Amino acid sequence: FDYVLANPPFNVDDVSLSSVEKDRRFNTNGIPRNKSKVKKADEGKETVPNGNYLWISLFATSLKSQGRAALVMANSASDARHSEADIRKTLIEQNLIYAMLTLPSNMFYTVTLPCTLWFFDKAKSDDRILFIDARNIFTQIDRAHREFSEEHIQNIAVISHLHKGQRDKFIRLIDHYFAAGMERLIENNEKIEPVCAQLLDVLDDANGKHAVDELLQHWRELEKLQTHYAQYRKEYVIAAEIDKKNQTQRQLRSAFDPFFAALHEGLKRLDK
């Protein structure tokens, strides 16, 4: 196959060894075996201790010479020992593994089991393996469920692009975030003064009223920042080199940092 996407059952333990040990789809990289020697009375009845690496081998051997695969696998497969460690070593020596991404728990709707995404690429241009720890990146849906937002997915994907040296995709993503953020600020600009007026009407202590006044003063700095953003857009479009585009982005962020820090501090003061 050119591409394989798979979410196989985890930790299957009832596969007969005799049904897979002579099948090249499963034995090319080695077969998972029990650590202890099988008793003579049980010969021919032996099972594979865990089916995770049977799935891994199946997907690895199913790829064409330029093929790629992405599979969901139990976390335990990432550091399984004994015969499974030997298979993993073989996959690394074959330079098949492109990346491994550790996911947060509670990403499935029916089980809490944490898992890891394995990525294979038979057309890798180097011998590096990208490891991404995304266990603390999620949106909490409810007490038992989590998911990635669209921004989470884009941010994780851009790590892979940077790993491949594709800085232009990172720069474009940051530019997109700047544009989206500026749009949200402008959308909310008209609402700030009415909200502050309502707060002043209901607050009866001087500290609270002062915090609202300060917050409004900080917000009025947005007009200057709109000028900064317009200048950034001009320089970004003109800049031909990636480093120059990135420099303009850093300058814009430096201009916005005090604005957001002041708003954050003002909201904390108001919350008291």
For the regions a language model picked out, list residue spans one by one:
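A conserved structural/catalytic subdomain of Rossmann-like adenosyl-cofactor enzymes
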Residues: 2-272
